[in-house]
């Protein structure tokens, strides 16, 4: 068994793929394998994946029909043989050649379920780093209620970004912690579930991952129809998230924090809806709210008076008037 499997979903990323995989191949730590998951690319990325696999024995390729990043990550996770797994985006890269060596010398031996580290970012067109993730307050092994710690510290990036983490493979597979397919913001749905199941993690202050901020990415060029789809996904994340946390029977101290976190997603979706000009887009989001009205009962967990009031308004006034009020209150 290798120590680490690196999973790289690839979709029309020919321009960036060699730099991405090169940052892994340059690592001084050698006990890893790489799985490239070609998600139905049409720009020549599939051929490049095969070429890279022919040149490097540690590289293998999965070719599949296009299903999105979640589907590609799930395919890679199911095929992963390493003790740990690291998901890397095909347009990003590792920060230097000693990332895995440094983590191996301290974090891998602690056998954590999750290893948290920091990331930095540059905007395409300039190689200058323009943002660095703040340090974690904790350094080393952390055992106990990891989700509560994350929510209390408001580590938002930690709850929504998988690339600045390494996961124990068996931990994910045994808990069936796969990505939800067919939604936007799938990382936001996945990570809180993963963290809620973890009891032994490692925080590292090292900056080990570099994000490329692309102006042509789908998330950087939204339109109202796409925004409506994303708003519906936020509602689904809120609903499935609270359901999962209820099934996990979180502690009385943690459940209010988790509920407040997911109510934030629902509130954002309502604000988005209130701004739409298209009646069809408004209707689409409101229909998603009505379909999941059982979520409103979760307001009983909330400690914030403002959020509890929203739950009451949804139940008493209904969806449309409450969405309008939320837009007025929070949409400035």
Task: Give, region by region, the residue ranges found by the protein language model.
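Short, well-formed alpha-helical segments that are part of the catalytic scaffolds
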Residues: 12-26
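A conserved acidic beta->alpha catalytic loop
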Residues: 38-48, 65
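Short alpha-helix within the catalytic core of nucleotide-sugar-dependent glycosyltransferases
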Residues: 18-22, 46-47, 82, 95-108
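Membrane-interface aromatic/basic loop that binds lipid-linked glycans or pyrophosphate carriers
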Residues: 273-332
């Amino acid at each position: 068994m290798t120590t680490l499997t690196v999973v790289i979903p690839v979709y029309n990323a020919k321009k960036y793929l060699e730099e991405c995989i090169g940052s892994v191949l340059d690592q001084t730590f050698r006990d890893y394998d790489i799985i490239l998951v070609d998600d139905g690319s049409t720009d020549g990325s599939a051929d490049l994946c095969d070429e890279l696999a022919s040149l490097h024995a540690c590289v293998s390729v999965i070719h599949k029909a296009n299903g999105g990043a979640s589907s590609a990550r799930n395919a890679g996770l199911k095929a992963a043989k390493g003790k740990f797994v690291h998901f890397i985006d095909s347009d990003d890269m590792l920060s230097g050649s000693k990332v895995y060596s440094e983590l191996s010398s301290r974090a891998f031996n602690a056998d954590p379920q999750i290893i948290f580290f920091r990331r930095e970012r540059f905007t395409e067109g300039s190689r200058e780093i323009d943002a660095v993730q703040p340090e974690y307050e904790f350094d080393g092994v952390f055992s106990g209620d990891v989700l509560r710690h994350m929510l209390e510290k408001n580590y938002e990036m930690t709850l929504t970004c998988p690339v600045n983490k390494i996961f124990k493979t068996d931990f994910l597979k045994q808990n069936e912690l796969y990505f939800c397919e067919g939604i936007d913001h799938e990382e936001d749905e996945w990570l809180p579930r993963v963290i809620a199941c973890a009891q032994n993690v490692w925080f590292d202050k090292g900056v080990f991952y570099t994000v490329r901020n692309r102006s042509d990415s789908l998330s950087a060029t939204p339109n109202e129809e796409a925004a409506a789809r994303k708003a519906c996904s936020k509602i689904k994340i809120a609903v499935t998230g609270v359901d999962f946390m209820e099934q996990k029977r979180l502690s009385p101290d943690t459940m209010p924090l988790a509920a407040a976190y997911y109510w934030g997603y629902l509130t954002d979706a309502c604000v988005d809806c209130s701004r739409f000009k298209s009646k069809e887009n408004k209707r689409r989001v409101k229909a998603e709210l009505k379909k999941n009205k059982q979520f409103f009962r979760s307001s009983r967990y909330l400690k914030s008076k403002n959020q509890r009031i929203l739950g009451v308004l949804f139940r008493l006034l209904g969806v449309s008037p409450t969405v309008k009020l939320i837009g007025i209150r929070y949409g400035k």
